[in-house]
A protein has these predicted regions:
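Short helix-to-coil transition segments within interhelical loops
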Residues: 20-25
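Membrane-interfacial helix-loop-helix junctions in multi-pass membrane proteins
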Residues: 106-163
Length: 180
């Protein structure tokens, strides 16, 4: 939502056009938007965690793994949010991806159950879900329990982030829906 509003303000004020015609490489512009999205996401996450710690306490099994997966997840969702903002033509379109893509992926990503409880077919289908790898890496960082090898989880989240980054860079270079 915030990214979408920023995009509309940038188009209205012609800021994005100024960026696109500037001598700054597109990948640096993209990194700026991604860093902004990550900072906002991490800020909200830290505030929610601090608020939760007021009511309860929890241990962390591996602080480096937890920090790494939180950063990688915020990176991936920042890029995905930027792509969603580029494709959304109005405020209502912003909710299409979270409603029809993100929610089912979350429910099928092992958030509420172990994927070992699934049948072979659905377990194999779940292996194509990037949220499964984020959830399992985060679960390992907090509790030390995982269904998937932690290296494999980090590799898949990293691969998904690279693919999304390259797609966002392609959209930025093409100027898709950015130049009016």
């Amino acid at each position: 939502t915030v990214t979408r509003r920023q995009r509309q303000m940038c188009i209205r004020d012609r800021n994005i056009e100024e960026l696109l015609v500037s001598p700054v490489p597109n990948w640096i512009i993209l990194l700026g938007y991604i860093a902004g999205g990550m900072c906002r996401g991490l800020g909200v996450g830290i505030l929610v965690t601090l608020l939760a710690l007021y009511f309860t306490s929890f241990g962390i099994h591996s602080i480096p793994v937890t920090i790494a997966i939180v950063l990688m997840t915020s990176l991936m969702f920042s890029i995905a949010g930027l792509i969603n903002a580029i494709f959304a033509s109005n405020f209502d379109d912003i909710s299409i991806i979270p409603t029809f893509v993100l929610t089912p992926l979350t429910y099928l990503g092992g958030v509420f159950y172990s994927i070992n409880l699934l049948g072979d077919f659905w377990r194999d289908v779940s292996m194509f879900n990037p949220i499964l790898y984020m959830v399992n890496a985060f679960r390992f960082g907090i509790s030390g329990i995982t269904d998937i090898n932690i290296i494999w989880s980090f590799s898949m989240v990293g691969l998904a982030s690279v693919v999304l980054f390259l797609f966002a860079l392609h959209l930025l270079e093409k100027g898709s829906r950015l130049r009016s």
